[in-house]
Amino acid sequence: MSLDKESHSRDYLYGRLLAVADVAEASTYAREDSRPTNAKRFFEAFSNHPYQTWDVIYKSLRPYLDRMGRGGSVRYERMINEITSMFEHDEFKNNSPLSPEFLHAYSCQVNELYTKKTNDNQEEE
C-alpha cells in the first residue's frame, strides 16, 4: 500500500488533505497530549460533507501552522496547496459523501508523512 501522488480522484485527494491536516496539527502537540486533532474530530462530518467540512478543518489548522514556525508551516502548506491544485474545480466544490477510497488515501498519506519524519530524524542522528 503506497501513496499514489498521481491520482486525481476527488475521494483520494480529499483523503490526502485530511491526512496532512491531521499530521500537521498533531506535530504541534506535546508528546503527552492525547487530545484528538480537528481532522479526527470532524472525520465523520468530513466523509459526509468534504467541501464544507474542509473549510472548517483548514481554518482550525491555521493557528497550528502559525505556531510551527516558517520551516514546518511551509512544508505542510505546500502539500495542501499541491493536493488542492490537483482537483478539478467542480470536483473540489462537490460536497457529496466520499467513498471509502478516501480512507485508503488517508492511510497512505499518513504513512508517508510519518515514514519521512522517521527517516529525517534518523539522518539527523
Predicted regions: what is each one?
Residues 1-125:
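Intrinsic-disorder/low-complexity detector
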